[in-house]
Amino acid sequence: MPMHESFFKVTKASESEFKALKGQSVSLALLQFGPGGINPAHIHPRSAELLFILKRQTKGLVHFQMNEEEEKDVVAVAAFGSANPGVVVLPTSLFGSGIDSEVLIKSFKTDNVTIQKLISANMG
């Protein structure tokens, strides 16, 4: 499936989307990355994750995935040991949630201008 630059799409299969999973304690997510696409840093507070890269490769650190290809798509499947793994997208949770700027300045050892730029970019 060709995708435009920086495209990232998640198709979930959890109890909410697929009723047959009710009581099974599993869920799945299909991840599609267009060239330059990124799955922002996040955690799953109620589950571990097993990620299979189905097409090409991505790079990941403490939980983000990114397609570094300039012209090719990446496709991955993430499987979870929970029917409801949840997801907390860290940029939005940290900079879009109303945490006091002084806390963020001290936590990230940076200045107010930088924090305000991050807050502005992550307000939903």
Question: Whereabouts are the PLM-identified features?
Answer:
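Core residues of folded domains in eukaryotic genome-function proteins
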Residues: 26-29, 47-49, 59-61, 72
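A short, N-terminal "cap"/entry segment at the start of jelly-roll beta-barrel domains
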Residues: 1-29, 40, 108-124
